[in-house]
Structures are given as structure tokens and as C-alpha cells.
From Swiss-Prot:
Residues 537-551 have a biased composition (Basic and acidic residues). PANTHER family: PYRROLINE-5-CARBOXYLATE REDUCTASE, PYRROLINE-5-CARBOXYLATE REDUCTASE 3. One of its GO terms (biological process) is L-proline biosynthetic process. The keyword Amino-acid biosynthesis applies. It holds the Pfam family P5CR_dimer. Keywords: Amino-acid biosynthesis, NADP, Oxidoreductase, Proline biosynthesis. Belongs to the pyrroline-5-carboxylate reductase family. The keyword Glycoprotein does not apply. Homodecamer; composed of 5 homodimers. This is Pyrroline-5-carboxylate reductase 1. InterPro entries: 6-PGluconate_DH-like_C_sf (IPR008927), NAD(P)-bd_dom_sf (IPR036291), P5C_Rdtase_cat_N (IPR028939), P5CR_dimer (IPR029036), Pyrroline-COOH_reductase (IPR000304). Pathway: Amino-acid biosynthesis; L-proline biosynthesis; L-proline from L-glutamate 5-semialdehyde: step 1/1.
Amino acid sequence: MKLYDNGVAVLGCGNLGNAIAKGLVASKQFKSNQIVLTKRNLSTIEPLKREGYHVTTSNHDAVSRCKIVIVCVVPAQLDDLLDSIKQSVTENHIIISVVSGASIEDIRSHLEKDVPIVRAMPNTAIQHCQSMTCLAIRSSHQKSTNSPSDKAKDNALEVAKKIFNCLGMSIVLSEEQIVPATALCACGIAFFCRAIRAAAQGGCEIGFHAEDAIRIAAQTAKGAATLLLENNFHPEYEIDKVTTPQGCTIAGLNQMEHAGFSSAMIKGIVTSSDKAASLYTQKQQNKKQQQLKQQQHQQHQHQQHQQHQQQVQQQEPHQYQQQQQQSHQQSQYNQGHNYGHQNQHHHNHDDQHQNYYNQDQKRRNNRKHRSNENYDNHHHHNQQYQQHQQPTQQESQEQTQQPEQTQSTNQSNQRRNSESRNGKSPQKQPQKQSQVQQPSSTTENTDQQQQQQPPQEQQQQQEQPQQPQEQQQQPNVVDEAERPKEQQQQPQQQQQTIDKKGYNNNRRGGRHYSYNNNYNSHHHRHNGINKNSSSMYHDEKRHEVKTEQIN
């Protein structure tokens, strides 16, 4: 960046900073490209950029590019601004401060450098090169010497006078008078404008238009100021020239004085001066009070700590040593805890990767396990179907043979009944034929026993009263050797129930749903055949009982 030897940086381009920048260009002592303006919000000073001014938000860049720095911020923003330019300020810079209430020593101590600082108090008329600027370089009790620092201060004062004389008029005062000058010089613009406005309102009341009244009042005030500045007379001298005996001027002045015109102006200026003195110092006082409170609090804590140590030392020595060891262990633990806390992020990152890997392995194992289970279930269903198909074929063959056996048993029963009526003893049949034609129920076995009994016992049985039908229908107990076919039917029925339970439990697998449905329909058909065969058996049994009752 190019450092302009005669360049000016205006930090804080508000109303006053904007007026100073335009006044510098209007004085023809500076060009617009030699002035750098800074502000937080650049939208308000964007038109100045089109006029050739350098605009930025960085105070550091502005100070590094210019030798003369004019600080134009409000007192509340001064500390932050000084912090931002502390590193870029050198002893070759000239700092001109227009901040109300901030002394030279406050600014120098904050910058921590022996930089020449000039306090200035202009007004907004500087825009038209009509400002009255008050300057100060040192306090009243300080005197100029031939030291390098004093020479640098005097040189800085001459540069400031040269700048502000081009913008109006300047006067050198002591630093103690800068605060009252703020009320009279800077605030005076507002006071005199209010007086001009009051005069314009009076002109409207007596018949003038507002614009005409303001123009007449403002030009009259300018003429009055010119008379005082050019002639260097007292204001009362000019007043006496205007007033005449029993005239209108003296009548109006007297009415203003009765209303308190002069006293109101005086009171307003004094009040403004008092307030200007406390703008920055009040903030500093608040900071000092806070610092004092902190110091007092620290001292109080230090005293309490010392008292506690004295009490501990007065105790037994071993207790004191134990407390020291505990404090040392606690400090070591805290250091280790802090180190672990710093590395906690890395450990957590590794744990997350390990968890992701474990979850992936679990998912893969579950998929393998499910596929193996499905394969086993499918194989088990095939085995069940094959086992179930074999007994159904055997039962179908038995059912075809069963009607022939029933016909033979009916014929034998009819023959026995006819012989019993005629009084003939039944003929004994050979054992081979009985073994071939085995009855399917226990009632046929009882008939064979009756045939083997002698005729006397048969007559006694006929003489006995007939038992109820329910008792007659109960099957007689036979030995296990005489009914081998019943032993074969019981395991088949148990196998069917086991297969049915296994089918119902295995039906939950979703992959073999269609196969299981076929198996289920076949199983119900088989159950239907068993039901029909059992019903045929009971019908034959009832028929035999009826024939016995008739006999």
C-alpha cells in the first residue's frame, strides 16, 4: 500500500467526519483520492466513493496508508477503535482527536506509544469552511521544552492549525478549556440555529411565509456575526446602534429579558459543558469502580486463603501432610482428565468405527442363520410329507379289504343266530380260518367265546335279563396278542398328531407357504377318510346289538 505523506484518514465518517472530509477537499489543500474514510456501514458513504474518496471498513488499513489520522467517533466507541489501530500506529503519525471528554493522556496510555496527539473541537460549519475550531496540545501547567517529544508536539500542532485554518478559523487553548469549548463551539451551532428558528416563527406570526422568514432570520444572524468579527466590537455596542428611545427594538429586547432569553441561553451552555465533561470520564469512572471491586474481592479471597492455611498448619503435622498429598493427587488427576478429554474425540471416533463393523458382522451372521433355518425347514417338510404319504396308502388298502370282512362277519352272525334258535350247538371253526378272518372289533371276539361255551351256559345266559343297551355296547377287554392290528393303528394316529403339530409350527416360515397349503389339504382329506371309516364301524356295531336284542 502507498503511504501518502500528506494523506488524511478520517476514522468514523459520521456527520462531523463527513463535514471534515468535504471541507478538506473544498479548501483545495487535499484531493479526494488523498482521503481515506472508514465506517462500519458503507452504504451511507457510498456516494463519497463515486467522488474519488477511498472507503473501507478497516481502521488498520486506513492508518497504515495515511500519516494524519483524525478520530471522529463517539466516546463510547473510542476504546474499541484504539485497540484496532494500536499495532499500526507509529511515532511518525499525528493523531487528531475530536472526541468529547477524552484527554490526551487517556489516548496515549491506551495506545502505549509516545505519539503526538492534538485535541480539536470543530463544528459542522467546517463543511463550508466556516468552522470555529479549538485546538490543544498540552495542559496549562505544561510548558514547551526543546526535547524531541515536545518538538514533535509543536510540529503536530502546526499541522493541525494549517488544516483547520483552511476550514474556517482556529484558536489554540489549554486542554482544560477544550471541554467548555465543546458547549460553546460545537453545541453553539444548535443554540444559534434554535434562536434563528424562534426568530423565523415570530416572522410567520407577523405575516411572513416560513421560507422567507427563515431566510431573513439566517441572513440577519450572519450579518450580526460579521459585524462582530469584522469590527471586533462588543455586542452591546452594535445593540445600542439599533435601539432608539421609545422604539420597537428596545421594547422587544425588554420582553425577551422578562421571559428569560439571556438566562436560558446561559443555563443551556453551562449544562452542556457539564455533560461534555462526563461523557468519557463517566465511562472511565465506571471502569475504575469495577476494577476496584475486583481488587477488593481478590484481596478478600487472598485473606481467607491465608487464614485457612494458618488453621491447617496449626493442626497435627501428619494431617497437614495428608492434605498436601490429596491436593497434589487431585492436581495430577485434573491434568490427566484434561489430557483424556482432549483425546476423547479420537477414542469416540475409533469406537464408532468398531461399532459399525460389529453391527455389520451381526447382520451377515443373521442372514446366514436365516438361510440355514429355511433350508432345514424345507428339508423337514419334505420328510414329513414322505412319512405321511406311506401310512395313507396302507390305510387305503385296508379300507378296500374292510367291506369284504364286514360281509363275512354278517353271514357268520346270521348262521349262529339261526342255529341258536333251532337248539343246535354251533360248529367249531378251525383256528386257521379265525386267524385269516380276524374281526375288526371286540364284539366279534365275544361271539366266538359264546360259540365255544356249552349249551347249558348258553341257556342260562338267555334266561338272564337283558342288560341295558349302553352296557351291551361297551367292548369287551381282549388281550394284546389277540388284537395286533390295534397296536398298529395307535402309533399311526400318534404320528399323525405329531405331524400335524409340526406342520402348524413350521407353517410360520413364509418361504414354503404354497407347499404347506398343499400338505394341509392332503391332511384334511386323510382325516375325512378316517372319519368315514369310524362311522361305518359304529353302524355295524349298532346293527349287531339290535340283532342280539331281537334274538
